[in-house]
């Protein structure tokens, strides 16, 4: 008992609050158990459960520095703490279980919404990115194949496989028909986007379809080998179709030109400044002006470019000599370059091969109203706006600056028009210049050939003057003996033959000698001189008449 009293006396001042606290904790535990059984929902809301651990921590802190506390009390307090912790942990564990479920649901919803938004954005991008190759684009075979592979949709002018097959059979037709090998080569060369080398089944399917329809007939072989011929249709059906076409064309008005086809030409004409490199100029001139023979004689083009730069008709931006890029100079709206065929070729080459082709909407509006006014100007502007939007969606054009129906646009595909399309009004002038050049060259050739006849005329003209008549007579008398000598040589055999006939008396020989003398050289001289006298008699007569008139006066 002494130990108990001593312990009680020692512990009394500080142990009482601990004991009271332990009792209160037991009461709280009992209350919590009842609440757990009856009202589980309120547990999550109550914040009183979080307070006991703080008091426990404070008590523990107070207990640590006091080594004199009895072992029983310490054991009881430890047991109480252990009993207190599990409900708190269970309640705390239950709280986060409900929260993550709500958080997971919210995260799922947000992720679904973001996915939907991303899908919508991707769809919109796909709609904007979808590109087609326009009919006006000037691309080589390799460029066309690359563009068709890159774009999701094939170019619009490409026909279907059945039409391609009939076209290939007609193109490769021979006496024994068109072979499958020739058809395949033709399609691969002309339509590389089909990739027939890798997808040969397309040709087989098309052959089978056309054979079943009766459009094609197999002349040799079996299956997808051999040769084929296009079956000719009866003559009655095409006549009917022609008549229908004629009627429809007579009734229907002529379709207006689409602005889609007009805009590329407008871009090439309105784009400023116009410049092109020497290689592009040479390529264009050799293609559309074969008469100039630029491939064989490139020095002509180089000299023409250097001459134009010296005159101030062109400006050399880069390079030296005939290399680099050249820019057109203008006086107002008209270019300074022009005149000869070579200069006109350079002008059209720079205007056509200028890249990139850009144009403002104000210039486009002005161009359309001047060249394609239509019935209503407001409606035409509305059509222009719609066509620009359509071209931008298809990927034919790109808006560089501005928004909507303002700013500047740029062509996304190359467009190199021929000189006839680019400057249609200047073609006849060029042809006239060519004709004039040809006429001048022909005149020069004729002048080179004409000088000898002019000398003959110079000899004949002085004979008309009466003062020089004597000199002409002398000249004319000189060649006369030559002619008479030739005639004498011919006339000599006649008198040789005559003597054997003339064996009659001498009386008859005299007249024969006189007769023979007349057709001899003397006779040949007399007609020439007499003719000359007859030609010049009127001249003498005129002179005598003039003298007589003077005498009378």
Curated annotation (Swiss-Prot):
Modified residues (N6-acetyllysine): 190
Subcellular location: Nucleus; Chromosome
Domain comment (free text): A central region that included the first H15 (linker histone H1/H5 globular) domain binds at the entry/exit site of the nucleosomal DNA.
Protein name per Swiss-Prot or TrEMBL: Heterochromatin protein 1-binding protein 3
UniProt motif PxVxL motif: location: 255-259
GO terms for biological process, alphabetical: cellular response to hypoxia; heterochromatin organization; nucleosome assembly; regulation of cell population proliferation; regulation of DNA-templated transcription; regulation of nucleus size
Listed PROSITE patterns: H15
Pfam families, per database record: Linker_histone (PF00538)
Organism: Homo sapiens
Annotated region described as Disordered, given as residue ranges: 29-134, 140-159, 230-255, 422-553
Function: Component of heterochromatin that maintains heterochromatin integrity during G1/S progression and regulates the duration of G1 phase to critically influence cell proliferative capacity. Mediates chromatin condensation during hypoxia, leading to increased tumor cell viability, radio-resistance, chemo-resistance and self-renewal.
